[in-house]
Amino acid sequence: MNFTPTHTPVCRKRTVVSKRGVAVSGPTKRRGMADSLESTPLPSPEDRLAKLHPSKELLEYYQKKMAECEAENEDLLKKLELYKEACEGQHKLECDLQQREEEIAELQKALSDMQVCLFQEREHVLRLYSENDRLRIRELEDKKKIQNLLALVGTDAGEVTYFCKEPPHKVTILQKTIQAVGECEQSESSAFKADPKISKRRPSRERKESSEHYQRDIQTLILQVEALQAQLGEQTKLSREQIEGLIEDRRIHLEEIQVQHQRNQNKIKELTKNLHHTQELLYESTKDFLQLRSENQNKEKSWMLEKDNLMSKIKQYRVQCKKKEDKIGKVLPVMHESHHAQSEYIKSLKDKLVQEKKLSNMYQEQCISLEEELARIREEEGMRREIFKDRTNKMGKRLQIMTKRYEALERRRILEVEGFKTDIKVLRQKLKDLEQMLYKATVNARANQDLALLCEVRDSNRRAHKIQGELKNLKSKVFGLENELRLC
């Protein structure tokens, strides 16, 4: 808004001067004007406004300015509503972003819980393996006792002894080392199955040899079982220690995350509260400014109406003055005495003219100061717009980064689940292959069974160490993935 016109129309005044007033000399006029300026004080603003006599051009100019001010006021109100809508959208985006962060934290917590459950399941599997080993050892001991009793007592001619490999409705968990021993015992016990020719009484020499042979087998099996039990105990102890350490680390990490999350939430709440407060203050200040400007415009409109009324009165007074001048021209001799009064009237009119010029200069200065204030307000509004745009851009970038992190976490979780499934399948296949190899070795090599068993035990120990190394590698990979997730 530019209130200072570049070419402002001049206020026209018609001063009625008699023909005799023109004869006054220049120095006397100047002296009279100076005396009048010193003697008469400046009138009040209401008197000045009442004595203004603007022209039609000036009135049209200010009417045009008032229309421009009204249009600009409407534009500013529309822009203010747009800014309000944009701020509301920004608050909605901030709420959505906060919800996304909470969902990501919940997913991370669920992932850590799943890892803890996985460790617990592994420990349970180890316990089941140990229980299975204990039951198989007990089964072997029972079979040996039965065979010893049969060898000592002997069997009748029509008596037949049967050994069942597996009792019905029994659930077992296969293991690589004990399975080999069980198959060896089954192959040995298959010689004592139902056959009327073989199950008869044998000589005492064969019974002694078989008892010695069984004693050696029992000793080797006991040593093997003790070694495997020691390894299994160490492995379970190590896994328990690792699981306890991981659970403790997870608890500490969760506590730190909760504390940090609470701090961030408090900080976000404070910042959003401050932002809402500043936006409300800005909205109220702009609304007050627009209201004040509309009030000023209404006052200017009322002034314009008063000016129109004054102009109409001035026209009437001019008509009356013309009539009086005509009458005075007819009665010149009588008016000669009023020459001094007319000269004083002219001086007063000149004083009024000087005062009106001063008032016009003062009004122009006020308009310039108002324009400077308006420019300053516009600059502040531009700076606020730039700050608002920067904030919206930053919030959009942050939302994109958080969505990308959420998608990456989902992909990692799916890949980890698939990796665990494939590792379990590979280990099961290796276990089946090892069982088949041991079965073939025990079936084909009967001549030199002791050495073959020791070799197979040595190979099985090596493979067990190899599988333990692979399990350690898998654990290290899981720990690496957990560290990456924590860093993310």
Swiss-Prot record:
It comes from the Eukaryota. The keyword Coiled coil applies. There is a cross-link at K51 (Glycyl lysine isopeptide (Lys-Gly) (interchain with G-Cter in SUMO2)). Residues 55-118, 208-488 form a coiled coil. The modification Phosphoserine is found at S36. Residues 21-48, 192-213 are annotated as: Disordered. GO terms for cellular component: centrosome; membrane. Keywords: Coiled coil, Isopeptide bond, Phosphoprotein, Ubl conjugation. InterPro entries: CCDC77. This is Coiled-coil domain-containing protein 77. It comes from Homo sapiens. The lineage of its organism: Eukaryota, Metazoa, Chordata, Craniata, Vertebrata. The gene is CCDC77.
